[in-house]
Every structure is written in C-alpha cells, then in structure tokens.
From Swiss-Prot:
Keywords per UniProt: 4Fe-4S, Chloroplast, Iron, Iron-sulfur, Membrane, Metal-binding, NAD, NADP, Plastid, Plastoquinone, Quinone, Repeat, Thylakoid, Translocase
Taxonomic path: Eukaryota, Viridiplantae, Streptophyta, Embryophyta, Tracheophyta
Gene designation: ndhI
Quaternary structure and partners: NDH is composed of at least 16 different subunits, 5 of which are encoded in the nucleus.
Reactions listed under catalytic activity: a plastoquinone + NADH + (n+1) H(+)(in) = a plastoquinol + NAD(+) + n H(+)(out); a plastoquinone + NADPH + (n+1) H(+)(in) = a plastoquinol + NADP(+) + n H(+)(out)
GO MF: 4 iron, 4 sulfur cluster binding; iron ion binding; NADH dehydrogenase (ubiquinone) activity; quinone binding
Stated name of the protein: NAD(P)H-quinone oxidoreductase subunit I, chloroplastic
Amino-acid positions noted as binding [4Fe-4S] cluster 1 in the UniProt annotation, renumbered to this chain: 64, 67, 70, 114
C-alpha cells in the first residue's frame, strides 16, 4: 500500500511542478504582449539608419590623388585604382576607380584612412541585384548620391530608437 501512496504523492508533485513551469512560461509570454511589434512593412516602411551607419561608399573623383591608401588598408585589397604618371607635372592622374560591393565587407577602413576625404559612407543599403556584376561600381556610379530615406516621400520612415512618451 505504501508504494502506491508514494507513487501518488510523486505524481502529485510532478503535476504541481509541471503546472508551475507552464505558469512561468505563460507569464513570460504575457510580459512580451505589451511590447510594440518589431517588424516593419519593408517596401513601404523603412528604418532611419543611425548617424554612423556604414552603407554604400560615395566617391568624389576630383578630390582623389591616386595615392592608393584605400587599397593598402583594405583587408581584401578591393578598390581598383588605375592611374598614369604625368611626367611634366610629376603627379599621378587618376583614370579609373572602382569598388565591387559584392565582395566589400563595409569595414570603412578606406573612408577612415583616405588623406583627401574623397570617400565617405552613405546610408544606402539596398544593393541587391539579379546579376552580381552589377555590384561592380565605377567612379560614375560611386559619385551618385543616394536619395535620403528621410527625403523620400513615397515611404514612411520609422525611427529605430524607442519612442519616449511625455506625460
């Protein structure tokens, strides 16, 4: 008789323990119920990027002196700088500058170490294409400034910082 009683007590304790675990899980679920949704409707709503966001690189052809510092500091030797030496003025003349964003890791070293500040990071992050060769940008494509997310009237911008209610 006692083994049956101890099994019944163990069964009761296990039932109470299981109910407690289910209750704890339910309380965690309820604590998340009052939060705002994190997902956004992407093509119609976009997050405003942070101030120091590292997006597509912008290049100013007139400022570049073809020193190739950007190539030396890049961990994957990505920027392609073509230049020729002008013997009469003893300076390099930049012919072509290109970056393949299919390979770029957006580390920002090229922007940080550029002595003439001809490179800068933009807030553009939509670089998807159907052909990877379209991600190879030359100096003309790199010189294009993107449309700011805030200035685009066709979409609703959402700040990624939490909303603080006054009052």
């Amino acid at each position: 008789m006692f083994p049956m009683l101890t099994e019944f007590i163990n069964y009761g304790q296990q039932t109470i323990r299981a109910a407690r675990y289910i209750g704890q899980g339910f309380m965690i679920t309820l604590s998340h119920a009052n939060r705002l949704p994190i997902t956004i409707q992407y093509p119609y709503e976009k997050l405003i990027t942070p101030e120091r966001f590292r997006g597509r690189i912008h290049f100013e052809f007139d400022k570049c002196i073809a020193c190739e510092v950007c190539v030396r500091v890049c961990p994957i030797d990505l920027p392609v700088v073509d230049w020729k030496l002008e013997t009469d003025i003893r300076k390099k003349q930049l012919l072509n500058y290109s970056i393949d964003f299919g390979v770029c890791i957006f580390c920002g070293n090229c922007v940080e170490y550029c002595p003439t500040n001809c490179l800068s990071m933009t807030e553009e992050y939509e670089l998807s294409t159907y052909d990877r060769h379209e991600l190879n940008y030359n100096q003309i494509s790199l010189g294009r400034l993107p449309t700011s997310v805030i200035d685009d009237y066709t979409i609703r911008t959402i700040s990624n910082s939490p909303q603080i209610k006054n009052g």
